[in-house]
């Protein structure tokens, strides 16, 4: 029997069980816990494509037709990083959905082939060997200010956006709201052309139940309560009353100035009901200085936006100018300046790092063009994980020492932009993880570029975005290699591989017949019983206290000191600008 060293095996087929992979230039390492595609248990039967390799006629490729159940696409030998684990496997895709995770090939001559991974003449191959596969990212906080954000989102590995807007209107620049049935219809039609799942939020700042039901029938999948529209206790209660009846989620940006009440009053108005708290730390807005305390409540689903991720020596300086622009404020007006300065507190931004690391803040979004960068959701998440490993060391249950694996930490952080927002907004029956039955919204990463630039973004089973060289070159790889749209990004393909998530009431009311869209409308699941306990690996409920005068933060009684990072991975090493 021929023996292969681990290094030679990894060069041929990719890493296997027990091998560790560094994520970009961070200090984070992940370890493969199982190899379903080869490795120690199935060595010699790996499915690999290429000249002189396995997946050829009457060898690794069998005779199974599509009618026999052959997959449309197989991703070979990828390392799956998801909230449920870190394994290596072949992934089968059929009709735009994941059909199997296991061993692909030809069962006539190969052992252990999964019955739904029988490679036939109708099967395309994407080489995942040596690469990391994650679920497409979900940006849970998007201002739809300009259509160009779609390209930036795809280029950052995002395949679903949750938010609202109508373009560069003042309401949209400040709030993630698509108000009213007419705007909802036009935005659903406009967004039909991009390879991106869409979740639009209607305006929840009203005590008019009729207005909110009208928006749900018009295509809203939930609501946004924003202080710039007046997040009063009465509006909070009215919005959540409709949400409870409809089964949809509400996202909230609370009252920074405490004009309508304090954080305790907002929590009283919420009344123990499920709610998604945007930018829970507060620099993006919310009760000053203690909105961060809501992350300790079991009914509140807290998220961050990426401009404060992680806390660095530059975070405070850039925030003041961003805030003035985003909320239509003027530096020359003292009251406007005081409003802005009250929101930016280094102590709460620093505490936000720790709350992410212990799993108390469950999600990360962008706040795109409204104090955040849509293309940096994934990158900022992993920068935070790196900073926390350097400061706190390995999590309990992870490996110790310089080369110890960080599997728990990696699974916790990937969940923040995949499964957690999917669960929070009732999307997890369709997206949010690499699991059988879900849409094949997947991202392949070269380990050296993990979290920075995807190798390929697969949307509903089609490659929609990829790193690609000069189109006039003789091969695909000559420089400049840039993230570029692929055939899956064409409007007709995008409509076939993406969905609009809407409230069940919209489907029941015949919205599909009233608007000009080609893609499928999918009802969100009932989320009214979703609480922090349903946030995978991000369900911690610490006691959080903020001193009103000094802004000192205590988490479970201990002060978390400010130590802003002066250097980050995944930064200038990868970018010219």
Curated annotation (Swiss-Prot):
Compartments in which it is found: Cytoplasm
EC nos: 3.5.1.5
The keyword Hydrolase is assigned to this record: yes
Residues in the signal sequence: none
Post-translational modification note: Carboxylation allows a single lysine to coordinate two nickel ions.
SUPFAM superfamilies, per database record: Composite domain of metallo-dependent hydrolases, Metallo-dependent hydrolases
GO cellular component, one term: cytoplasm
Pathway linked to the protein: Nitrogen metabolism; urea degradation; CO(2) and NH(3) from urea (urease route): step 1/1
UniProt binding sites for Ni(2+) 1: 141, 143, 224, 367
Catalytic activity: urea + 2 H2O + H(+) = hydrogencarbonate + 2 NH4(+)
Disulfide bridge partners, by residue number: none
CC cofactor: Ni cation
InterPro entries tied to this protein: Amidohydro-rel (IPR006680), Metal-dep_hydrolase_composite (IPR011059), Metal_Hydrolase (IPR032466), Urease_alpha_N_dom (IPR011612), Urease_alpha_subunit (IPR050112), Urease_AS (IPR017950), Urease_asu (IPR005848), Urease_asu_c (IPR017951)
BP terms from Gene Ontology: urea catabolic process
Pfam family, one: Amidohydro_1
Keyword Hydrolase among record annotations: yes
Key words, A-Z: Cytoplasm, Hydrolase, Metal-binding, Nickel
HAMAP family according to UniProt: Urease_alpha
Homology family: Belongs to the metallo-dependent hydrolases superfamily. Urease alpha subunit family.
Quaternary organization: Heterotrimer of UreA (gamma), UreB (beta) and UreC (alpha) subunits. Three heterotrimers associate to form the active enzyme.
Protein name per Swiss-Prot or TrEMBL: Urease subunit alpha
Organism: Mycolicibacterium smegmatis (strain ATCC 700084 / mc(2)155)
